[in-house]
Amino acid sequence: MEITNVNHICFSVSDLNTSIQFYKDILHGDLLVSGRTTAYLTIGHTWIALNQEKNIPRNEISHSYTHVAFSIDEEDFQQWIQWLKENQVNILKGRPRDIKDKKSIYFTDLDGHKIELHTGTLKDRMEYYKCEKTHMQFYDEF
């Protein structure tokens, strides 16, 4: 018995229609279905669910590093930054990174959920940690 993959990512949103537009227009999501309070999109090969929940306090989101990260090609990195700026997306200050840890852009959606666009892979991250984070214990080879 095993878990085979991430099934979907669900975001609680305050306004379904504006969130659909954000995920379609900004992240190039493909809208699959929408209803009164729920919509499904795909971004890359990832199923994104949006559930409208208007009366949920959203201020706790800004205090957490919790986020979802999507992969982008490194050659498109500057283009993505420009795209997000042109569309007035709330770009966050990223954490300091070693170049071996690849590149990331952090920003928020309309409800403050943190999203990352990252140029590295899991293998890249593990190789970086093996070289730079000698205090870490590794369990599998990549």
From Swiss-Prot:
The lineage of its organism: Bacteria, Bacillati, Bacillota, Bacilli, Bacillales. Residues 5-120 form the VOC domain. Belongs to the fosfomycin resistance protein family. FosB subfamily. It holds the Pfam family Glyoxalase. NCBIfam families: Fos_BSH (NF000493), Fos_BSH_Sepi (NF000063), PRK04101.1 (NF003152). Mg(2+) binds at residues 8, 67, 116. Its EC number is 2.5.1.-. Its cofactor is Mg(2+). Its main location: cytoplasm. GO terms for molecular function: magnesium ion binding; transferase activity, transferring alkyl or aryl (other than methyl) groups. This is Metallothiol transferase FosB. Metallothiol transferase which confers resistance to fosfomycin by catalyzing the addition of a thiol cofactor to fosfomycin. L-cysteine is probably the physiological thiol donor. The active site is at 116 (proton donor/acceptor). One of its GO terms (biological process) is response to antibiotic. InterPro entries: Fosfomycin_Res_Enzymes, Glyas_Bleomycin-R_OHBP_Dase, Glyas_Fos-R_dOase_dom, Metallothiol_Trafse_FosB, VOC. PANTHER family: FOSFOMYCIN RESISTANCE PROTEIN FOSX, LYASE, PUTATIVE-RELATED-RELATED. Keywords: Antibiotic resistance, Cytoplasm, Magnesium, Metal-binding, Transferase. It is found in: Cytoplasm. One of its GO terms (cellular component) is cytoplasm. Homodimer.
